[in-house]
């Protein structure tokens, strides 16, 4: 079986670190193709040393230069890129099989959409992308064949509960009467004690 190439957005955050931990234990089933982070250069550099991705991306050009200098100094061949366009590039590169979107907030919108448009399997921890542009994202997924898998706790629980029903045609959401309402309780975030 061919190893799956994966891009991890937000690799220095909690979800990204957890994903890399799983990959490290996956018996070479996955290859880290690219990593991205906002600003934690030291953590990202350590991840680059361990996983040897083809690309690493940070938003800021100065931080990208710092990271590039560290890689050159340590004879590491990972190509360092910067900017939102580079986030999109590592989401849509033809060699990528799977994209994990672990970036928080609205900055995940463009790389997430790029992954979906390119037909990638998308492991989505970022809820904001669907909240802001759900209809656009779902239409793009239908057109490209992209599979979107929610990996954040509550959303993944719903996915695990509902997806077997979709596979056996027990529910038809197009009629919008098989499931009238889904209620998510707040387990964290800004609305926990609201």
Feature names for model-found ranges:
Residues 18-27, 46-47, 130-146, 161-164:
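Active-site-proximal loop->helix
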Residues 67, 105-118, 127-146:
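Rossmann-fold NAD(P)-binding glycine/threonine-rich loop
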Residues 137-155, 181-182:
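Rossmann-fold dehydrogenase core element
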Residues 1-56:
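N-terminal Rossmann-like dinucleotide-binding module
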Residues 57-59, 79-86:
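Short acidic-hydrophobic, aromatic-tinged amphipathic segments that line or gate anion-handling sites
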Residues 12, 48, 99, 119, ...:
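Residue-level signal for inorganic ion chemistry
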